[in-house]
Amino acid sequence: MSFEVFEKLEVKVQQAIDTITLLQMEIEELKEKNNTLSQEVQEAAGGREALVRENEQLKQEQHVWQDRLRALLGKMEEV
């Protein structure tokens, strides 16, 4: 009877070890995925910053052209 108890205990311990091993592998996979996603977020943030700067530059250029157009229209009205 004692031997059967030890066999059952051994099976349960082995199952626990297998479960722990699988969970450790899953944790490693999730860590890798997290690192990949973190890099993607950083790249996206950098891309966003570049787009914001480009947008500001384009707005400034638009204002310059609008001012030039207004000046040209003003000269045309004088004629």
Curated annotation (Swiss-Prot):
Superkingdom in the source lineage: Bacteria
InterPro entries: Cell_div_ZapB
GO CC terms: cytoplasm
Biological-process GO terms, alphabetical: division septum assembly; FtsZ-dependent cytokinesis
Keyword Cell division belongs to the record: yes
Keywords (A to Z) from UniProt: Cell cycle, Cell division, Coiled coil, Cytoplasm, Septation
Subcellular location: Cytoplasm
Coiled-coil portions: 6-78
One of the Pfam families matching this protein, by short name: ZapB
Family to which the UniProt record says this protein belongs: Belongs to the ZapB family.
Complexes and interactors: Homodimer. The ends of the coiled-coil dimer bind to each other, forming polymers. Interacts with FtsZ.
The protein's role, per its UniProt record: Non-essential, abundant cell division factor that is required for proper Z-ring formation. It is recruited early to the divisome by direct interaction with FtsZ, stimulating Z-ring assembly and thereby promoting cell division earlier in the cell cycle. Its recruitment to the Z-ring requires functional FtsA or ZipA.
Protein name: Cell division protein ZapB
